[in-house]
Amino acid sequence: MKKKAIMFDLDNTLFSVYAIGETLFAPLFELIEQDGTQVQHMNKIRDEVMRRPFQHIANDYRFSEALTKKSIALLQQLQYNAPIEPFEDYALVRQLPVDKYLVTTGFLNMQQSKIDRMGLQNDFREIHIIDPSTSNKTKKDVFADIILRHRYAKEDVLVIGDDLQSEIKAAQELGLDVIWYDKYARYEPVPGVQKIASYQQLLAIL
């Protein structure tokens, strides 16, 4: 599998959100608990906030409009200001002799603070943060734009991420090759989707 460009997700693909999540999202969890309408769902919400866009969670658990607005206002301000360690195998990503792009969905301040804390700024040709609270863009839109602007053939592009319903689905809809990064083997294999748990495996594939 020879590629000229690889597009990476950020959360749970380059680092573990679970390593910082309890601290980062503590104000959000407190807000939801104080609201009192999601007590029976809190454990699930705590887990899902670490790996899914908040807007989807609020919709799935039927947050009130007021709670959703308060939560989004809070999340728009949240930043993480302590050091963040990327996955240990991320060092192998830095060495890849291809064009690398970072495409992440989330609140701008929060995602930028993660990037800054890991020092990723110079590792990628471009970094794209898609903030659903201010933009209707999708990862599919960004992938397509990168391919168009840089004149890549689709077969020269690979997308790597942890979310089957986000970057993996978007890439498949564009006809791009994908690799599903499942660091801790949380999920069962899916037919037709190549899965890895380490970037050492990526080197073997490339």
Residue ranges and their predicted role:
Residues 49, 88, 106-107, 163, ...:
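Short beta->alpha linker loops
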Residues 12, 102-106, 162:
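Conserved residues at beta->alpha junctions
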Residues 33-36, 62, 97, 119, ...:
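Glycine-centered loop/turn motif at secondary-structure junctions
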Residues 68-72, 78-82, 90-118, 126-133:
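Substrate-recognition element of Asp-dependent hydrolases with the DxDx(T/V) motif
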Residues 2-89, 94:
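N-terminal helical cap/lid subdomain that shapes the substrate entry/recognition surface
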Residues 13, 108, 186:
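Conserved Rossmann-like nucleotide-cofactor binding loop
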Residues 1-4, 101, 112-206:
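Asp-based, Mg2+/Mn2+-dependent phosphohydrolase catalytic module
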